[in-house]
Amino acid sequence: MSERKLFTSESVSEGHPDKIADQISDAILDAILAKDPEAHVAAETAVYTGSVHVFGEISTNAYVDINRVVRDTIAEIGYTNTEYGFSAETVGVHPSLVEQSPDIAQGVNEALEVRGNADQDPLDLIGAGDQGLMFGFAVDETEELMPLPIALSHKLVRRLAELRKSGEISYLRPDAKSQVTVEYDENDRPVRVDTVVISTQHDPEATNEQIHQDVINKVIKEVIPSSYLDDKTKFFINPTGRFVIGGPQGDSGLTGRKIIVDTYGGYSRHGGGAFSGKDATKVDRSASYAARYIAKNIVAAGLAKKAEVQLAYAIGVAQPVSVRIDTFGTGTVAESQLEKAARQIFDLRPAGIIQMLDLKRPIYRQTSAYGHMGRTDIDLPWERLDKVDALKEAVK
C-alpha cells in the first residue's frame, strides 16, 4: 500500500487582530517612505478593545500624521461600526516613536567593508540592520510556486473578505481564519484536500445553518478546485458554534505574530524575523524577499522541483555570511552549483537587494495581509521570473 501523508497550513483575514497590527505598521512605513525613501523605520503596533498603540524607532525628516494613517487603515479593513468593539473613528490612538539608536545606525549607514576605505563599491555602504537568518522557498505544486495548503488557505480568507466588502454576504464581520489539510502521495505530490476549517466572525442574527451553507457554496467550492474535493473531505465551519465577538474586542493583536502565515505555512523553515513595519535595511524583510526570489527562479528554471534558500547576515556587514540552497533531492544540478550561481546573479548585500528589488518604494501595506509570497493579485518584484535564463546559463 502506498504511503500518504497530510500537511496543514492556516491563514487569517485582514480583520484578525495580529493582521490589523501588521497592516497599521506597514501603512505607517509606506506613508513615511512616500515622503522619505531613505528613512529607517521599525514600527510596531499593539491593538485591543478600543485602543491602538504604535511604538518603535524611526529616523526620518518627514512628517506623517500617524493618527490619520491608523484610522484610515482600520476603516479600509472594515472596522467602521462601534458594535464591533473597535471602530476607526472612536478608537484611541497612542503613538510612541523615537529615533533609531545611533549605535545601530552607525553600522547600517557605514558597513564594515567600507570603514576607512573610500574606494569600495557604493553598494557595500549599507550594512545589515541586524544579524539573523532568512529563508526563501518555492515548490512546483501550484502555479504561483507555493505549497498548496498555504495557497488555498490565503484564497479562502481573501474570498471571505471579497464577499463581505461587496455585501454579497451581508452578515460577515472582518475577523476570520482558515486552515487547509492536504493529502500528499508517496511522490510528495498533492492529491486531495482532506480537511477545511473556516471560522468567520458574523452578526448575531446569522444562523449556523446559513453560515455553513454560504461558506461551503460561496467560499470553499469557489476557491478549491473540485478535483481536490471528494466525499471524504471534512468541513468544519465555525466549529465553536458562535463567532460574534471578534477582532481586537476578542483578542489583542501584535505586529509580527503571524510570520508563518506571512510566508509558507510551515512548509519551509523560518528564521524567526517578522516583516511588517520594517524598512528594507532590515534583512529580516529584504533578505527573505531575496531568498524567495532566488528559490522561485530556480524552480521556474526547471533546476529543481523544490528549493529552499537560506541567507545569513552579521549586523553592520554588507555581504551575507552564508548562502545555502537545499533542493531536497529534486535538483537537476548540484546544490553547490546553484549556490555559486545565486551569488553571481543576485546581489545579496542589503543595498544590492534594495536596488535589485526597488525596495525604497511604498509597496508594503499591500503585502501585510494574505501573504508576502506567491501573490498573483499584486505585482511584487520578488515574484518575478526574470532570472530564469541567467540561472540556466550559469549552471551549464
UniProtKB/Swiss-Prot annotation:
Positions with a binding annotation for L-methionine: 57, 100, 251, 282
Cofactors named for this entry: Mg(2+); K(+)
Location(s) in or outside the cell: Cytoplasm
Pathway of action: Amino-acid biosynthesis; S-adenosyl-L-methionine biosynthesis; S-adenosyl-L-methionine from L-methionine: step 1/1
Keywords: ATP-binding, Cytoplasm, Magnesium, Metal-binding, Nucleotide-binding, One-carbon metabolism, Potassium, Transferase
Enzyme Commission identifier(s): 2.5.1.6
Disulfide pattern: none
Cofactor note: Binds 2 divalent ions per subunit.
CC per GO annotation: cytoplasm
Gene Ontology molecular-function annotations: ATP binding; magnesium ion binding; methionine adenosyltransferase activity
Region of interest (Flexible loop), ranges: 100-110
Domain of life: Bacteria
Broad class of where this protein is predominantly found: cytoplasm
Binding site for K(+): 44
Assigned protein family: Belongs to the AdoMet synthase family.
Quaternary structure (record): Homotetramer; dimer of dimers.
Name this polypeptide is given: S-adenosylmethionine synthase
Gene that this polypeptide is encoded by: metK
